[in-house]
Amino acid sequence: MAKQPEDWLNDYPAEEEEEEIIWVSKSEIKRDAEALKKLGTELVELSKSALERVPLDEDLLAAIELAQKIKREGRRRQLQFIGKLLRTRDVEPITIALDKLKNRHNQQITLLHKLEELRDKLIDGNDDVIDEVVALFPQTDRQQLRTLIRNAKKEKAANKPPKSYRQIFQYLKDMAESA
């Protein structure tokens, strides 16, 4: 008896799990490689103390330290090599650590701006602002803060240099750091 077309399919063993083939364009591969090379360049530009905060293995760390010593064409080749090393590693923890390093500076600037605004409110405001400062920083000495505010107002009225003005900011900065 002749085999039916349905029987021909049974002659070949069916794969239990078919793997999905993901097609990636050559341009996308190049973009990814370039992004990793830029990440490597950022790592090379970091100081030694900042590099210690980034999770790097020994090979990658050695390659980065070598790239920091090399100049010109050798440096370019070393950056290519660092990009190659990064392709074989999980770069997510590295990028997270770099973002934290970059954002730390932005967070400090934001904090300083908030403290400046608070200082200006203290000098222009009333006791409600002092209560707000005490709520933010419980270790604040009200009497010392009031004295600084009073002195700053006197200096401003007499057109003297803003010594107490700066002291209020420094006091608030110290309170923020100790909180």
From Swiss-Prot:
UniProt lists the family membership as follows: Belongs to the DarP family.
Give the organism, scientific name: Photorhabdus laumondii subsp. laumondii (strain DSM 15139 / CIP 105565 / TT01) (Photorhabdus luminescens subsp. laumondii)
Which Gene Ontology CC terms are recorded?
cytosol
- What's the chief localization of this chain? cytoplasm
Name used for this protein in its record = Dual-action ribosomal maturation protein DarP
> What's one GO BP annotation on this UniProt entry?
assembly of large subunit precursor of preribosome
Q: Which InterPro entries does this UniProt record tie to the protein? A: DarP (IPR006839), DarP_sf (IPR023153)
Keyword set, alphabetical order:
Cytoplasm, Ribosome biogenesis, RNA-binding, rRNA-binding
This entry's Gene Ontology molecular function terms read: ribosome binding; rRNA binding
Intracellular or extracellular location(s): Cytoplasm
Gene3D superfamilies reported in the protein's UniProt record: PSPTO4464-like domains
Q: What does this protein do?
A: Member of a network of 50S ribosomal subunit biogenesis factors which assembles along the 30S-50S interface, preventing incorrect 23S rRNA structures from forming. Promotes peptidyl transferase center (PTC) maturation.
> What Pfam families has UniProt attached to this entry?
DarP
